[in-house]
């Protein structure tokens, strides 16, 4: 609210100053500027014209008055002439004129003052009425707002208190329920924790039992795998035996054909014998006559050879017999070749030998059956050796890779290839399984020797010594092959042994192969690592002699050949064809195993690159991948594949890569004692059994529990024989125990999952309870904040109401001051009216006295008096009209500004006791305000929207002397209402 002072609240000194200023401005007739609208401006222009016309009339009247004054002066001059008579009259006339002038001046001043006071009173009354209405409206609105706000506050407070009570009751009930649930959940959690502890203990026990069961399962898996390997080997052996049976049938047919050919030759021999008998008779006669010399004996031998009884022996170095001879008497042709050495008395033995040949064929068939039975009995030993071979193939390949890396040439690997070629040529098809066993034994011994040679070759750099060692190795391998062939022969297959006796000995006694293995392994363990090669060879030969096995001589193969050269070539061709077909089938089956080996090597390369960056290992892996692709494309052989694989594994062992929990540094790969077999590429079927099953799962199946520490013959075979002797009942019992353990484990896991789900549900419930508590706390906080906001708003309303009351009191004080001022002005107005009445009475008395005094005067003088009275009346009428015009102008100016200012709701209201002021007015005030009441319609009609926009127009015309002080008051009112309207 604007704090400017009210324009009517002024002191009496200011009022007198304003009155003097009005008088001065009237005298000076300076132009005054007021704020009016356009319509009012047009009306005022018309009024100005009328005022100008009236002013012209006034000037005319003043001129007339001047003329009259001149006339009076002349009359006075005339009267002076009559001094004696006119002194009294002149004095009275002068006093009357001066009194009249003074009264006229006072009357004009009082009239102007009265006009200003009446205008101020009118404006103040209008403003008071307007303010009374505005104050009443404001008070009514404030009261209604107070009542509404109080009602709203009461309603809101009641609703919020009810809501808060309800929320508190709900939250307290919820909190009680949640506390009960928390107690229940705590009890359940305690029970669950106890049950979980028990379950954890149970799980620990179950985990221990599970670990034990897993170890047993692993053991059983290993046994099952060994059994599967046995089954696979048995299948393969059955396949080999079927092939052998086919070969034996073909051999039988060939032996029948050879027997027929032998019979034919025997008939020819009989004929030749007859001739020889005749010749013998002739010779006897000659002997009787004369003993022949050496030249004659040589001629006789040449004649016998020319007859067809030559020696059919072949060197065993070029070709060995494919059929195992049981005795030197197996082949009749060997005896036919020595006919010249026998005397003529032994010719009858040839007939018996034919019968012996047929009996020998039958005995050979029975012997093959017995050998099959002995083969079935020895399959356990053979399977153990093959399993060990499969487990140590990786290590042997790493050793071969080390030998390749340490030796400048590939003589260490050319040696097994040569052995392979010689064994394919020397081993007969009928003894395939025996020769495989013997070859595996030879591999084991040769592998240990090769590892020791690789150890000894580190410190030797002379090429001549290496050449001699390679030659010695070749001779040693040749001798070992012959030795293993003899060791694989059963005891009953000697020259004069029967089949029943051989089978009984093979069942009762330990096989010579195992004895020979034990002796050779003991010899190799007893010898130091740096021992000479010749010493190792001598010790092995002594062990072979102690075992009772004689090494075959190189010229012994000629005595064992019982077939002709054509039959040997045919048999070798048939065996090579069978082997080629077997190799082709096995290579197709080996493709999966080779791919698994390749995947394992790629896994090793990834592990190696992750552990450390080694370029040599990556190069060897790349070489292995190229060889793998070459093997798949049949560009390279499996030998190259195995060599590259051994190099990769050696490099991986040097890098000490941990593969599937088995660290490579835990196994001593350089020790010759831990080598069981050497993976020689002798037979592709054996490679399938060793490498394909070895890398069936992508990694080695060997472990520390399966490999013995000393790796000798007894410790290598006896545990395997013991573990393989599982009965079906024990196996089924173990399966049942395994199933029970799995079921118990599954039930425990299910219980654990159920408890976990319960615990998760309780945790969810706790989380929900916590979230509900948080939401309740949040809602409680929101309610408190709302209450605080309501309290603050109530406080702000109270402060506002207090401010309004203060403003009301201030307005009341101002209104009281205005009332006092109005009362003072009314008293002054009354005094002025009383003075005016007194002056009028004096004028009337003067006028009455003047005719009495001027009766004596002449008629012209009376005429002048009459004219003066008429002029005075006209002057009074003009003054009245001027006053009315000034009042209208004064009433128009504040009324326009009052219309422009709209009543504001922020105006303070008056008390009901002060509202009666507008009605309680004096009767004199009502009389005085009667002229203004006549002007109210004009003021009401003067309202226009132009004034509301505060357009200020300047008036160029000068108003009357009584128009300045109301203009100041109107400007004060306009400033007040313009600021409130803004």
From Swiss-Prot:
**Where do Basic and acidic residues bias regions lie?**
457-466
Bias (Low complexity) ranges: 323-333
InterPro entries to which the protein is assigned, alphabetical = FPP_plant
Record bears the keyword Coiled coil? yes
According to the UniProt entry, the coiled-coil residues are 39-83, 125-291, 345-401, 452-475, 722-885
Region annotated Disordered, chain positions: 311-333, 423-466, 687-711, 896-982
Q: Where does the record place Polar residues bias? A: 423-433, 693-705, 896-910, 918-943
The protein here is known as Filament-like plant protein 4
Q: Does the keyword Glycosyltransferase apply?
A: no
Q: Which UniProt keywords apply?
A: Coiled coil
Q: Which domain of life is it from?
A: Eukaryota
GO molecular function term, any single one: microtubule binding
Q: Which family is this protein grouped under?
A: Belongs to the FPP family.
Q: How does it assemble?
A: Interacts with WPP/MAF proteins.
**GO aspect biological process, one term:** trichome morphogenesis
